[in-house]
Amino acid sequence: MESLRTIGKAIPADVRAVNRRLLLQHVSEGRGRVSRADVVRLTGLNTATVSGLVAEMLEQGLVREVGLGPSIGGKPPILLDLDDRLFTVLGVQLTRDGFRIAALSLRGRIIEAREVVGDSDQIADVLVPAIQEVAASLDRTVLAVGVSVPGIVDHRGLISRSVLLHRDDFDLGGLLTERLGYPVHLINDSDACALAEVALSDDPAPTLMALYVGDGVGAGLVLSGALFQGETFGAGEVGHLNLRTHDLRCACGRTGCLEAAARISVLTGQPQSLQLTPRGERVEGLLDEKAAEHAARNIAALLELVYELIDVRRTVLCGPVCDLGPGLLAHIRDALTENEPYLGGHITVEYSRLGWNGTLLGAAATAAHKELGLLWTMIES
């Protein structure tokens, strides 16, 4: 597992690229309070290397000079900051019924977002023009695109399996890169939520589970600050875990899956995904209380299993489920206490402060990290 908040010094084979990432990360985290001398001290790089890289990034529009720092007996140092004005990364959330697309600054601030109805069977034909339209509306240059998908994204960057999209070994990233002309990077939707939660966290090495509940159900696991994806990148595929609490038929064809009891359409009693409802409106009234109680028992059973297995105590619910109000959380907490009173005081469950936007932010964060080495911290909630 690679820490999501640590970038080490380079090995000889990739010295320049890694040193650029190291410098840019420290400048970004400094938020206008670091000078070239500070970067030398923080990174351990020599003065000539830092001066050369800063000059290069100033010319490219990635870094800017923002003023003078306090003098310590000599010439005041020139302070540096990430230049957040010229570039954007795009985040895309892919669902069964359509897409959400957002343009974000290099600090993770959402500049523009929109929803697009589309058939997942024709992903590229719908998504490519939508991305091109968003890009054309901006006065910034697109560096890269991050796409969150409901399925396993393997080490090759392929969708190795997605029940909801009915795809196996699908090179969506390669297809989009070819048609768009931008680098495109894929990430599992629950892993994207987990990345966003790490960026929000005050803890430099948090341990948590981001449980995405939308068309499907999945978990993103962060252990001591590192995203855990497993040997074949399938860690967190809990939607088709059979907890033996019901016999409902799942989209995968089996019965008893967590997803069959807890996906958003079951919780609301609505056949269509909540992803396509108007934004900015609370929808507590859509929560089906009977279904919510049943889903809560299944979710509580999962939280208990994860706690007992790997000692993850904090769970953050992400995705469309965040719009369902406090009722579902209360049912989950009650179920935890009923199962084992001890657990009620040791397992915490809450909605993400990012709401729906966590998946988009995590997808865009993936693009920013892959292209520039930036690890977002203190993103806006």
Language model features by range: what are they?
Residues 105, 154, 222:
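Short, acidic, Ser/Thr-enriched surface-loop or helix-capping motifs
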Residues 69, 150-153, 214-216, 321-322:
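Short glycine-rich anion-binding loops that position phosphate/pyrophosphate groups of nucleotides
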Residues 65-66, 184-188, 221:
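General beta-strand structural signal in soluble alpha/beta enzymes
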Residues 205-261:
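Glycine-rich phosphate-binding loop of actin/hexokinase-like ATP-binding domains
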Residues 173-174, 228-230, 235-243, 333-343:
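Acidic-glycine-rich active-site phosphate/pyrophosphate-binding loop
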Residues 110-207, 327-338:
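Glycine-rich phosphate-binding loop and adjoining helix at the ATP-binding site
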Residues 43, 163-165, 185-191, 212, ...:
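Active-site nucleophile and cofactor-binding loops and adjacent substrate-binding regions
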Residues 1-68, 72-117, 121-141, 201-202, ...:
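ATP-binding/phosphotransfer module of carbohydrate and carboxylate kinases, centering on a glycine-rich
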